[in-house]
Amino acid sequence: MSEVLRGARRIVVKVGSSLVTNEGRGVDAAAIGNWCRQLASLAGQGREVLMVSSGAIAEGMKRLGWNARPKEIHELQAAAAVGQMGLAQMYESKLSEHGIGSAQVLLTHADLADRERYLNARSTLLTLLSLKVIPVINENDTVVNDEIKFGDNDTLGALVANLVDADALVILTDQPGLYSADPRKDPQARFIGEAVAGTPELERMAGGAGSSLGRGGMITKVLAAKRASSSGASTVIAWGREPDVLLRLADGEAIGTLLVARTAKLAARKQWMADHLQMRGTVVIDDGAVAKLRDEGKSLLPIGVVEVQGEFVRGDVIAVRSQVGIEIARGLANYASSEARLIARKPSSQIESLLGYSNEPEMIHRTNLVLA
């Protein structure tokens, strides 16, 4: 652990709802002040830090006097709008005590799915870092209802790490780290001090849901580490109330669980494609095409496509799945879904006669394809 964190120059820190709001009792000023002191100290060491903070909905619930998390989307959105005010004010106040400027950045996964908006978000965050300002990032829950239902800030933390090419992602949680089983239920649970991010066994170990305040459990943290590893960022999962946890990690101390990035770093455009959470459509391919993509690094040709699902246009990111539903890859479509249906199962030599024109002989070119 010492080398991974000690050498990290750009770090994304993610903190969850239960920590930020002290289990839903409202924004925990002391805890946020403590993290901000550590962030300021890291910045003083010449490191660049970004904070991904949950807690807007939980803080809004407290301000509105709600004891239970509502199920209606419009009520969740209202709580997020109310709570985001207090959250931003608290971070600004605590960071300013140390002479550090802060910036509020609200993102949705849709912002990162559009290539131009993705690059704009990246440019903004890198500019803030160059100005010695600490971005405080959250999902824009007020306007995107499907993220309130299914999203989580662990995923957002990984997406931000990939967006800015961070060296490390630190996920602060209410648990000491990852165990082989839920330690609250299994006294034989074994603590995992270090593992390789993306190891399938980790996902089996981390199964289970989180608290009623937040949206993720340990499984979302393991999956976030896997996602962050694709850009070369290693992940630490640690207890957020451990004294000086960020400073001690940066000094190389072994705290929590380290999930090391061992996969090859993706090129920038392929990283953007890999980070898509919601694809416009899907093409289902036969076993021969699966082998060509996986084993030979070939482009996807229309003749290997057996089914086209969804509606998409040329240039959209689409999923490529096997006939048993496993995602094989994703990439930029050379043809719209209506065109793809006409040329599926046909040799590339027939594209022009079928469509009246031919963009490319491939459904997805290998340079625009990233394997799952």
Curated annotation (Swiss-Prot):
Q: Which SUPFAM superfamilies match?
A: Carbamate kinase-like, PUA domain-like
The kind of enzyme this is, by top-level EC class, is: transferase
Domain named PUA is located at 280-358
Does the keyword DNA-binding belong to this entry?
Answer: no
Which sites bind substrate? S54, D141, N153
Write out the annotated subcellular location: Cytoplasm
Q: Name one GO molecular function term.
A: ATP binding
Coiled-coil ranges from the UniProt annotation: none
- Any one of the GO BP annotations: L-proline biosynthetic process
KW Kinase (keyword) present = yes
Task: Tell me the pathway.
Answer: Amino-acid biosynthesis; L-proline biosynthesis; L-glutamate 5-semialdehyde from L-glutamate: step 1/2
Q: Which Pfam families match?
A: AA_kinase (PF00696), PUA (PF01472)
Write the record's keywords in alphabetical order, separated by commas: Amino-acid biosynthesis, ATP-binding, Cytoplasm, Kinase, Nucleotide-binding, Proline biosynthesis, Transferase
Quote the function comment for this protein. Catalyzes the transfer of a phosphate group to glutamate to form L-glutamate 5-phosphate.
Give the family, as the similarity comment puts it: Belongs to the glutamate 5-kinase family.
Q: PANTHER family under this entry?
A: GLUTAMATE 5-KINASE, ISOPENTENYL PHOSPHATE KINASE
Question: What is the name attached to this protein's record?
Answer: Glutamate 5-kinase
> Which organism was this protein described from?
Methylibium petroleiphilum (strain ATCC BAA-1232 / LMG 22953 / PM1)
